[in-house]
Amino acid sequence: MDKIIVEGGQTQLQGQVVIEGAKNAVLPLLAATILPSQGKTLLTNVPILSDVFTMNNVVRGLDIQVDFNCDKKEILVDASGDILDVAPYEFVSQMRASIVVLGPILARNGHAKVSMPGGCTIGSRPIDLHLKGLEAMGATITQNGGDITAQAEKLKGANIYMDFPSVGATQNLMMAATLASGTTTIENAAREPEIVDLAQLLNKMGAKVKGAGTETLTIIGVDALHGTEHDVVQDRIEAGTFMVAAAMTSGNVLVKDAIWEHNRPLISKLMEMGVEVSEEEDGIRVKADTKKLKPVTVKTLPHPGFPTDMQAQFTALMAVVNGESTMIETVFENRFQHLEEMRRMGLQTEILRDTAMIHGGRALQGAPVMSTDLRASAALILAGMVAQGQTVVGQLTHLDRGYYQFHEKLAALGANIKRVSEA
């Protein structure tokens, strides 16, 4: 089992860092490669993450050829010919995002069986919106134990209103609708950049998707899709993590290839806090002096609100800012577990249901801490950089799901950090 050791206290990040393709984009893109019955699909700018290997295995388990060239960061998928309709439990159970294969398999084969997914232990994250939407399109859904079975000889276009703008449900229904007969409208759809990226891939495959990035999606079904090429969009959450890292260490960092528009909610709060953020030709520059920063109140919301996937990292920043900051988490319950670990480092915080009060400005102390989920692992490492003494972060399987060589990128910016293997 690996662990990360951080020697904190004097870290001031300087330089530039390159951002990978988005983890939250590439997983549904891989699910979409199930749809084309003709030709091959090439995905480029693919991040090398454990979740990507897991999703590759999910798709491969459908008797689809998947070749991952890690050196080129490319995945070539050939789904032409007959494919299986049962997603392999051993891989689906490892990752929440794997539920997005349900819609593509059903649309392609008329029948699909997928086990209840696994992944980070952040709240209940129910999949009822996925299932209600597919039922509206004519699917018969049955749940037996931990398995979900969906059947529909031919999906039919439908008007779907989602009670909540779920990213996963929007992706699942959008993909299923591409091969349905007639027109599907999804109201209150998720608007994240990863939704737009998926729609762009589907349209390159021959789909007719309109409205991606707005509250209303319209999909006109077609008879078949074909393979294509697509470059995965940059990871706004990785970019945001390094922006926060620069701010909390009084650093000066150019986050290369970061997209301003995708990070606008985070940038707005950084600037409100007093961080200097500027758009440059090849990325976003972040400069800060933590002594001059002021506390803020942040509420997580679906896009274009403040992203829940940046909540943990931002609370680490709040910890170094003098005064009382407030973080309100409205998207997922049970997403303040990292604060319990940061209490071991001396953080003073009170948590009441969906709200955390952060009493910042007091020096953190290095301590052994344990990652509780993907973004918490990054937050604890960032906290370790500004803490006095040594911080040891364990349970790195979470980190590897969403960050590629995180410790090496931080070290290149000046952090005193290393990753070691325990016997």
Curated annotation (Swiss-Prot):
The keyword tRNA processing does not apply. It is found in: Cytoplasm. InterPro entries: Enolpyruvate_Tfrase_dom, Enolpyruvate_Tfrase_sf, MurA_subfamily, RNA3'P_cycl/enolpyr_Trfase_a/b, UDP_GlcNAc_COvinyl_MurA. Belongs to the EPSP synthase family. MurA subfamily. Its main location: cytoplasm. Keywords: Cell cycle, Cell division, Cell shape, Cell wall biogenesis/degradation, Cytoplasm, Peptidoglycan synthesis, Pyruvate, Transferase. The keyword Zinc does not apply. Its EC number is 2.5.1.7. Phosphoenolpyruvate binds at K23, N24. Cell wall formation. Adds enolpyruvyl to UDP-N-acetylglucosamine. GO terms for cellular component: cytoplasm. This is UDP-N-acetylglucosamine 1-carboxyvinyltransferase 2. It catalyses: phosphoenolpyruvate + UDP-N-acetyl-alpha-D-glucosamine = UDP-N-acetyl-3-O-(1-carboxyvinyl)-alpha-D-glucosamine + phosphate. The modification 2-(S-cysteinyl)pyruvic acid O-phosphothioketal is found at C120. Pathway: Cell wall biogenesis; peptidoglycan biosynthesis. GO terms for molecular function: UDP-N-acetylglucosamine 1-carboxyvinyltransferase activity. The active site is at C120 (proton donor). UDP-N-acetyl-alpha-D-glucosamine binds at R96, R125, P126, I127, D128, L129, D309, V331. GO terms for biological process: cell division; cell wall organization; peptidoglycan biosynthetic process; regulation of cell shape; UDP-N-acetylgalactosamine biosynthetic process. It comes from Streptococcus agalactiae serotype V (strain ATCC BAA-611 / 2603 V/R).
